C-alpha cells in the first residue's frame, strides 16, 4: 500500500531510495458475486441488514472488533437501527469469545472459513463489510468483498485508503471513532451501490492483468536506467 511505502521511504534503510507501490492481485475468477437470498439461506442468515466482519482471529486486539461493537451499540442506543433488524456475521477463529457477549444485535459466528467459494458466499450475503483494524498493510478482505458486490467500511488510517474511495465505493471513518464508524455503516446501508460498480473498482485496479502490467513497467524502467 502507499501507506506502507511512505513508512519505507521514511526509514533509515530506504531513505533516499526509490520506493514503488504495486498492490496485491485478486483472482476475479475465484471471488465472484453469488445470489444474496441463496447465500443467506445456505449460511442460515436472516433476511435483515447484514454486516460482515472477518479475521484470522476475530478477538485479536489489532483487528478492532471492539470498535465495531461500540459502533453498533451507538446505533442501537440512538435508535438509528433496531437490534432485531440487523445481523452481524463473524468469520474467523478466536481464542476467547468473551467479546461476543457485548454484541448488541443479533449475530452469527461462522468460525474459521476457508475457500474462495465460501468467502464469496459470505460477502454476497452481506450488505456491508467492516474492517475496524487498528491498521492494515493492505486490506485484502476489502477487495474480496468489493469483488463480490459488498460495500466496505473501514478506518482512514492505513492501507485501506488505497482501496476505498470515500463515499464512492465505500466509507472511510475517522480513525478510532466508533461514532464515525457507525455513520459509515448507516451510509453503506442507505446508499446501495450496484454490484457491477463495486466489482469494477477492483477489476480496474487489482486484476491480474492490471497488476502484471505494473510489474512489467517497473522492470522496464529499471532496465532503462541501467542502460543509460
Question: What label would you give each PLM region?
Answer:
Residues 121-126:
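Short alpha-helical donor nucleotide-sugar binding micro-motif in glycosyltransferases
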Residues 1-21, 26-30, 34:
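A short, active-site helix/loop in glycosyltransferases that binds the activated sugar's phosphate group
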Residues 180, 193-208, 214-217, 221:
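A short, well-ordered alpha-helix in the C-terminal region of glycosyltransferases
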Residues 45-63, 69-73:
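Conserved donor-binding/catalytic core segment of Leloir-type glycosyltransferases
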Residues 134:
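Aromatic "clamp/platform" in nucleotide-sugar-dependent glycosyltransferases that forms part
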Residues 151-154:
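Short hydrophobic beta-strand element within catalytic cores of glycosyltransferases
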Residues 166-167, 171-178, 186-192:
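Conserved acidic donor-binding segment of nucleotide-sugar-dependent glycosyltransferases
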Residues 81-85, 92-117:
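Nucleotide-activated donor-binding/catalytic signature segment of Leloir-type glycosyltransferases, i.e.
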Amino acid at each position: 500500500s502507499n501507506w506502507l511505502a511512505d513508512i519505507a521511504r521514511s526509514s533509515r534503510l530506504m531513505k533516499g531510495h526509490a520506493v514503488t507501490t504495486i498492490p496485491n492481485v485478486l483472482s476475479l475468477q475465484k471471488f465472484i458475486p453469488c445470489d444474496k437470498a441463496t447465500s443467506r439461506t445456505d449460511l442460515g442468515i436472516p433476511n435483515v441488514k447484514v454486516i460482515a466482519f472477518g479475521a484470522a482471529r476475530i478477538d485479536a486486539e489489532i483487528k478492532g472488533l471492539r470498535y465495531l461493537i461500540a459502533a453498533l451499540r451507538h446505533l442501537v442506543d440512538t435508535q438509528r437501527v433496531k437490534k432485531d433488524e440487523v445481523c452481524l456475521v463473524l468469520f474467523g477463529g478466536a481464542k476467547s469469545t468473551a467479546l461476543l457477549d457485548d454484541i448488541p444485535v443479533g449475530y452469527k459466528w461462522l468460525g474459521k472459513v476457508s475457500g474462495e467459494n465460501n468467502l464469496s458466499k459470505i460477502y454476497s450475503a452481506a450488505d456491508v463489510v467492516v474492517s475496524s483494524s487498528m491498521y492494515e498493510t493492505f486490506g485484502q478482505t476489502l477487495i474480496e468483498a468489493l469483488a463480490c458486490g459488498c460495500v466496505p467500511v473501514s478506518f482512514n488510517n492505513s492501507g485501506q485508503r488505497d482501496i476505498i474511495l470515500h463515499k464512492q465505493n465505500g466509507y472511510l471513518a475517522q480513525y478510532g471513532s466508533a461514532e464515525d464508524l457507525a455513520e459509515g455503516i448507516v451510509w453503506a446501508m442507505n446508499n446501495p451501490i450496484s454490484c457491477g460498480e463495486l466489482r469494477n473498482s477492483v477489476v480496474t485496479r487489482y486484476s491480474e492483468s492490471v497488476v502484471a502490467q505494473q510489474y512489467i513497467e517497473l522492470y522496464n524502467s529499471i532496465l532503462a536506467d541501467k542502460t543509460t
